């Protein structure tokens, strides 16, 4: 039987996942992180994108987070995020529309254009599409 670590994924709405996992893969500010049992303690920011949990038995579950924090302790991994969605619940067509709208907004900047907000919308839509694509690969 593979070694496991307890993982909690929590959003502003409440607990989304709680259980034993063999591996957590998340997108941190410095790149992808793979967290396995026995990982060194760590706290880091997370970028918008997929979080992949490899559960006992090797099955994978993919979530989308809008960004947040990852805390690793000897027997626990905790993900704190503003927004969490199961990848299966994401609408790929809607994410593609949001991506196009954000790209158009960046191209049509006017006098009161908020570049930071437009770039954030673009990054979020792109991260949702990456999450959907990653979920498809895992199937």
Swiss-Prot record:
Oligomer and partners: F-type ATPases have 2 components, CF(1) - the catalytic core - and CF(0) - the membrane proton channel. CF(1) has five subunits: alpha(3), beta(3), gamma(1), delta(1), epsilon(1). CF(0) has three main subunits: a, b and c.
GO molecular function of the protein, one example?
proton-transporting ATP synthase activity, rotational mechanism
Q: Write out the entry's keywords from A to Z.
A: ATP synthesis, Cell inner membrane, Cell membrane, CF(1), Hydrogen ion transport, Ion transport, Membrane, Transport
Localization in the cell: Cell inner membrane
What family does the Swiss-Prot or TrEMBL record give for this protein?
Belongs to the ATPase epsilon chain family.
One Pfam family, short name = ATP-synt_DE
Query: What parts of the sequence cross the membrane?
Result: none
How the protein sits in the membrane? Peripheral membrane protein
For this protein, the record's InterPro entries field holds: ATP_F1_dsu/esu_C_sf, ATP_synth_F1_dsu/esu, ATP_synth_F1_dsu/esu_N, ATP_synth_F1_esu_C, ATPsynth_dsu/esu_N
Q: Which NCBIfam families match?
A: ATP_synt_epsi, PRK00571.1-4
What protein is this chain from? ATP synthase epsilon chain
CDD domains cross-referenced by the UniProt entry: F1-ATPase_delta
- Report which gene this protein is encoded by: atpC
Q: Main role?
A: Produces ATP from ADP in the presence of a proton gradient across the membrane.
Under Gene3D superfamilies, the record lists: ATP synthase delta/epsilon subunit, C-terminal domain (1.20.5.440), F0F1 ATP synthase delta/epsilon subunit, N-terminal (2.60.15.10)
The question of whether Ion transport is a record keyword is answered with yes
Q: Name one GO cellular component term.
A: proton-transporting ATP synthase complex
Q: Does the keyword Nucleus apply?
A: no
